[in-house]
Structures are given as structure tokens and as C-alpha cells.
Amino acid sequence: MTLSKSKLLFERAKKVIPGGVNSPVRAFGAVGGYPPFIKKAKGARIYDADGNEYIDYVGSWGPMILGHSHPRVLEAVSKTMVDGLSFGAATELEVQMAELITELVPSVEMVRMVNSGTEAVMSAIRVARGYTKREKIIKFAGCYHGHADSMLVKVGSGAMTNGIPNSGGVTAGAAKDTLIARYNDIDSVKLLFEQNKGNIAAVIVEPVAANMGVVPPKDNFLEELRKLCDKEEALLIFDEVITGFRLAIGGAQQYFGVNADLVTYGKIIGGGMPVGAYGGRREIMECVAPVGDVYQAGTLSGNPIAMSAGIATLRELYENPGIFENINRLGQRLSEGLGKITKYTVKAVGSLVCVFMTEEEVNDYDSAVKSDTGLFGRYFNHLLNNGIYIAPSQFEAMFVSNAHTDKDIDETLEKVSLFFARKSPPA
């Protein structure tokens, strides 16, 4: 497999873009080599500048649940764009999107559109503080909630990949009101409530911790969080940027049967376009300006092109509930197949799958970081060279889409088995 054009593009990019990329993990620093520059995508396949074809399990990091270039989404975007790209004013499309989300997710009575998951989380936290008149937020080690200053503490995703648990430029003041608990450990949360009595505004959690690999919640963990937040009169925020409209049409709340007070969304709700949203109970959301005193705004929020792509995606999912059955079945086939091939730990929830390069059980940040990242790098490059594109990080999920087929799963497992069949995977 040649990457000559991608190499040239990467060298050009490094002269004008920090690290040559617009998101750190894309630089392949954790796995080595040159990142392929992608030219086009269709269904479950992506194609790079050199003409190489890959079965894609990144899916733009989650949004492409229907597969790339889905006809319904492309048609919706094409019809909308001829009327204009952005107005900076209210449109019917943003009303339709909000109505659709509130219909599909009963716990969300009102919703506000933004442009990214980071914006959604940043805004939801501000709303939680404004509503409760409290300052402190509990998050979990290894969970990633975007790159707002107050959330860049013990994070997952790219920062975890690069060995940066915090970030330069984040002041002690910005992070002082963020408290860290241990994922899947309700006692660690109770202790923080005891130590900060009456001053915790909210607990924010990824219902499935999908930015330190894929770490499912233990039995009753989410239920216990719900009970504890009710008892302490704090809000429970579900970060469903990844799980929203993926695990089920109602997201993780429907999948696990636990409702949050506020929910953040991104990825799938944009159908591939830059979109985020946050929503929740009416009484909480009415704290947001111009109704309330919690200020949040955005020039491109509710962009009509993004709304049309998102509406088309959500309607396709709603009108075809068999999609969830199919992607969850494929996810199970993939995870069970991986589990038979390798001695290492495989975790999955629905269409989210991860192989941890450790033989220990993985339930939290501390156990996830025991993974052999060097081995993962060799595994990644073996798959890449054999036409299988997964995230260039041990601590990210494989995303199965409705465009994947059983044949794709079989081919993927065959390529994986070739790697692990070697007594000593190459250095």
C-alpha cells in the first residue's frame, strides 16, 4: 500500500497547520507513520488521496451511523443549500429539528442548537450552575467532554492518547470547580458530595465511557447516580455526543432506562455536518437567554444545511427501527469474533466496540491505561496496511454503521486473526 500523495500532503500541512492536523489524534502520533488523507467516502468505505480503499470503522468519529454519503442525507443537503447557506436568523428547519429531538427523547422537553459537542457541554454546565446556584461539577476520570477549559481535567480521547491528562493554557482557576470521580465507582461520587456538601451543581458522565476505549457502565451504576443526584438536589448530565441516537432512537437513556436532567448531543444529529445540542427539562432550559439569565449564543447555531442533514438522518433512523437491530447485531458479531481471536480484553455496547491490549478487566480509567499502546500501534498499522481503518488510538471506539455488512465483519476478523496468529506481533 502506497501513501506517497498523503505523505506529501502531510508535509505541506505541517508547514501551515500545527502538527499538520486540525485535531491532534489525526496526526498518528500514538501509532506512527503517515496519516492517509481522505478524498472521498461511500457506504462503509473510505478512499485516500493515493486511491487506497479501506473498510471504515471511524465513521467520522461516530456521526456516519447510516454510512457515508447516504442518499437521503445528500438529497436533503442539496435541496436546502440552493436557498442559502446561512442566515444568522431563525428558520423552520431548526424548529423541525427541535421538535424531532423532543419527540424522540421524552426527557428532553426543550433543546438549544449549537455547533459542536464541546459547545453543548460548556453550555449545559453553565445552565446547571445557573439553575442550581452552585459552582462545582463532578466528572469522571477518562471521560471526555470536549475541550472547554473546565473539562480538560483527567480527560479521555485524544488527550489520553497523547499522555496529556490536562492541557497547557488551562488555569488552576478554570479547573478548580471540576471534581474527579472514578467511573463505575459510586462510592467515589458519594465521597465528593460529602466533601462538598450543598455546592455540587451537577454530575456529568458519558453513559458509556467511549473516549477511553469502550467501557460500559456496571450494573446499576447509572441508576445509583440518578438516585444520588436526586438526593443531593444536583443535576445529572448525560454526555450523549457519542451514544445519542446510536444505542437506540432514544439514546443511552432509552437503552439503560435512566433519564438525565440535561443531555448533550453532537455527531449523529448533524448527519456529518458540524452540530451540537443540549436539552432537558423545561424548567431547567428556561434558564437560558433570552428567557432566563444564562447567556449562550452562536453565529452559526441552527445552520440550515446542518439542520437538514441532521433531520434526514434522524428521520431515517426513526422510520427504520431495524437499523438499530442490524448495527447492534453486527457489533455483537464483531466483538464476539474479536474475543475468540485474541486473549486481550474486548468491550462492546451495541455498535461501539474496542479491543484493549491488556488481559485485565477494564472498568475505568486506571484499568484502561494498563493497555499496551505499543502493541496497539503495531495492530493498528497491520490493519491499515490491510485495508481496515480504525481509530489511531487505543482509547477510541470502533463505530459500526448500517452500511457495514456481514462480509465486512468477516473480512475484518480475518485481517485481525492474521495479526494475532503471529507468535510475536512485529515491532
UniProtKB/Swiss-Prot annotation:
GO terms for MF: glutamate-1-semialdehyde 2,1-aminomutase activity; pyridoxal phosphate binding; transaminase activity
Biological classification of the source: Bacteria, Bacillati, Bacillota, Clostridia, Eubacteriales
InterPro entries: 4pyrrol_synth_GluAld_NH2Trfase, Aminotrans_3, Aminotrans_3_PPA_site, PyrdxlP-dep_Trfase, PyrdxlP-dep_Trfase_major, PyrdxlP-dep_Trfase_small
Organism whose genome encodes this protein: Acetivibrio thermocellus (strain ATCC 27405 / DSM 1237 / JCM 9322 / NBRC 103400 / NCIMB 10682 / NRRL B-4536 / VPI 7372)
Main localization of the protein described in the UniProt heading: cytoplasm
Signal peptide region: none
Keywords in alphabetical order: Cytoplasm, Isomerase, Porphyrin biosynthesis, Pyridoxal phosphate
Protein name in UniProt: Glutamate-1-semialdehyde 2,1-aminomutase
Entry EC number(s): 5.4.3.8
